[in-house]
Amino acid sequence: MQLVLAAKYIGAGISTIGLLGAGIGIAIVFSALIQGVSRNPSLKDTLFPFAILGFALSEATGLFCLMISFLLLYAV
């Protein structure tokens, strides 16, 4: 029984590695937004919705990883 519990904790820990990728993706999206606006400030209204869309997609992958981690800990 202890082996199964240890495997659950290890699996949940490994599944949270995807959160690192989500954080890096969000940083890249907003750094690209800052660079784009600094090069051409008049494009702010055009670039901002694309940045929010990129943020949402990156955050969704992180939330999926977190959901899998919680499922491994509490549902299995």
UniProtKB/Swiss-Prot annotation:
Its function? Mitochondrial membrane ATP synthase (F(1)F(0) ATP synthase or Complex V) produces ATP from ADP in the presence of a proton gradient across the membrane which is generated by electron transport complexes of the respiratory chain. F-type ATPases consist of two structural domains, F(1) - containing the extramembraneous catalytic core and F(0) - containing the membrane proton channel, linked together by a central stalk and a peripheral stalk. During catalysis, ATP synthesis in the catalytic domain of F(1) is coupled via a rotary mechanism of the central stalk subunits to proton translocation.
Q: Which UniProt keywords apply?
A: CF(0), Hydrogen ion transport, Ion transport, Lipid-binding, Membrane, Mitochondrion, Transmembrane, Transmembrane helix, Transport
Q: Any keyword Phosphoprotein?
A: no
Localisation per UniProt entry: Mitochondrion membrane
SUPFAM superfamilies with a match to the protein in the record: F1F0 ATP synthase subunit C
How does the UniProt record describe the way this protein sits in the membrane?
Answer: Multi-pass membrane protein
Chief location bin: mitochondrion
Q: Name one GO cellular component term.
A: mitochondrial membrane
Q: What are the GO MF terms of this UniProt record?
A: lipid binding; proton transmembrane transporter activity
**What domain of life does the UniProt record list for this protein's source?**
Eukaryota
Spell out the residues of the site Reversibly protonated during proton transport: 59
The UniProt similarity line reads:
Belongs to the ATPase C chain family.
Provide the protein name.
Answer: ATP synthase subunit 9, mitochondrial
Concerning InterPro entries, the annotation shows: ATP_synth_F0_csu, ATP_synth_F0_csu_DDCD_BS, ATP_synth_F0_csu_sf, ATPase_proteolipid_c-like_dom, F/V-ATP_Csub_sf
What does the record list as GO biological process? proton motive force-driven ATP synthesis
Segments crossing the lipid bilayer: 10-30, 52-72
The protein's matches in CDD domains, at most eight in alphabetical order, are given as: ATP-synt_Fo_c_ATP5G3
**What does the subunit section of this Swiss-Prot or TrEMBL entry state?**
F-type ATPases have 2 components, CF(1) - the catalytic core - and CF(0) - the membrane proton channel. CF(1) has five subunits: alpha(3), beta(3), gamma(1), delta(1), epsilon(1). CF(0) has three main subunits: a, b and c.
